């Protein structure tokens, strides 16, 4: 994953660390307007300024961020994904979670986003052992939109629909691990997905990985 790259480590291997900077686009890059400008510890102000000018030229919304795993955007989204993964094992369905977050104002929920990116990002077929739900889905050939099915099933125009097969896979996965499932309402889904994101945002500010709260927003 690009957001796992260490700009400082890359810069340390060069003779001009002050000229090294990261431009992190979000997928799909031709649609998503956000651009993270990743400044290293030794990146010069002039290089940051030039990168901001490039962002403006290509009509992107730029946010200057520091070097940390996930940078800012993916670091915060990882908190949402982690909690969403717990929720589906406790009884919420992927589309219930996605719908709750979409209705709240997100352009896409975590499982629709996973399908768009591809469930096999970072997944290794050779070492997969079925220990995670992602392992089980990938082993079943459910890689996301590109394979026609992931958490959802897709038609030829990539329109998604809830899939009873996924519901059965989740139920079986939970039962095998003796996880007690229950009904989970929309309010709990929102609280559990949003609060960790907010907390992570404050941590990012405290660490100086973002200059201002509006950059995180």
Description of each model-found segment:
Residues 1-217:
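N-terminal glycine-rich phosphate-binding loop for ADP-containing cofactors
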């Amino acid at each position: 994953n690009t957001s796992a790259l260490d700009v400082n480590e890359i810069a340390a291997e060069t003779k001009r660390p002050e000229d090294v900077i990261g431009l992190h686009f979000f997928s799909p890059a031709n649609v998503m307007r956000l651009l993270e400008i990743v400044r290293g510890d030794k990146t010069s102000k002039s290089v940051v300024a030039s990168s901001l000018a490039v962002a403006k030229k290509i009509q992107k919304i730029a946010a200057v961020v520091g070097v940390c795993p996930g940078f800012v955007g993916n670091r915060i989204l990882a908190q949402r994904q982690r909690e969403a993964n717990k929720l589906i094992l406790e009884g919420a369905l992927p589309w219930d979670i996605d719908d709750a977050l979409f209705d709240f104002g997100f352009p896409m929920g975590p499982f629709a986003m996973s399908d768009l990116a591809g469930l096999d990002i970072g997944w290794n077929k050779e070492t997969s052992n079925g220990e995670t739900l992602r392992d089980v889905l990938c082993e079943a050939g459910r890689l996301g939109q590109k394979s026609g099915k992931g958490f959802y099933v897709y038609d030829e125009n990539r329109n998604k629909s809830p899939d009873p097969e996924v519901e059965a896979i989740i139920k079986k996965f939970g039962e095998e691990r003796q996880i007690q499932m229950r009904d989970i309402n929309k309010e709990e889904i929102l609280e559990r997905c949003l609060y960790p994101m907010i907390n992570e945002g404050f941590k990012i500010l405290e660490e100086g990985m973002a200059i201002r709260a509006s950059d995180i927003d």
